[in-house]
Amino acid sequence: MKKNIGLVLMVAGMVSLAACGSESNKNEVGSAADQAEVVIGLDDTFVPMGFRDKDGELTGFDIELSQAIFDLTDTKVTYQPIDWAMKEAELDNGTIDMIWNGYSKTTEREEKVLFSDTYMENLQLLVTSKSSGITEFSAMAGKKLGAQEGSSGYNTFNNEPEVLKDMVDGNDATLYASFNEAFIDLENGRIDGLLIDRVYAEYYLTSTGKLEEYN
């Protein structure tokens, strides 16, 4: 697998953090830095942004960045693992104060939440096994596609059906709670391609020594 892995499906947007769900919350909320404690919702399997190390401790780029920022204001941070498909609902319900975990900024999501300034570019990729021979989107015709439920990749898959949805098996994707589960199925041939964030795919395949096995 080359450094620029996968087929680039679309630009999913810039990675940001988000806070405040409903209109009423938007009018009431102040700066998070003014709070004594904040609860951050995250997918704790999303490498390298927020995940658990071999000792079960949370680590990753977004974990360290958020800790560094809130240390400046002596704000206590609690990290709350959530169902990624329910992240905006968790925000609206007030069970978390913000989402900070590789959360891509999209037009659709901007209608639901308030975003911070963006701090990283992210792409959505179609990753396939080299043994599958799939090196272009058209080769996914009749094939099984996987995606994470609630991900920006799956949202765009539905919003731009002419790219992949209209041709894949069942005109839909097999949905997973985490990319970890999706990669297991990809590796075992239960799906033929996976829609995934570039930052996750590059880290996962490099750290597992499988970079050369995938397109």
Regions found by a protein language model. Give the residues of each.
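Acidic, polar ligand-binding/catalytic clefts
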Residues: Q67, K76-A139
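Short loop->beta-strand "edge-of-pocket" segments that line small-molecule binding or catalytic clefts
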Residues: V38-L42, S138-N155
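Extracytoplasmic small-molecule ligand-binding "clamshell" domains
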Residues: N27-G102, L175
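Short helices/loops that flank or line small-molecule/ion binding pockets
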Residues: L72, Q80-P81, A85-M98, K112, ...
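C-terminal motif of bacterial Sec signal peptides marking the signal peptidase cleavage site
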Residues: V15-A19
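Bacterial signal peptide processing site
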Residues: G21-E23
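Ligand-binding cleft/hinge of the Venus flytrap
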Residues: S66-D74, G153-L175, L205-K210
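A ligand-binding cleft/hinge motif common to bilobed small-molecule-binding domains
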Residues: M86, Y103-E111, T156-N159, D185-N188, ...
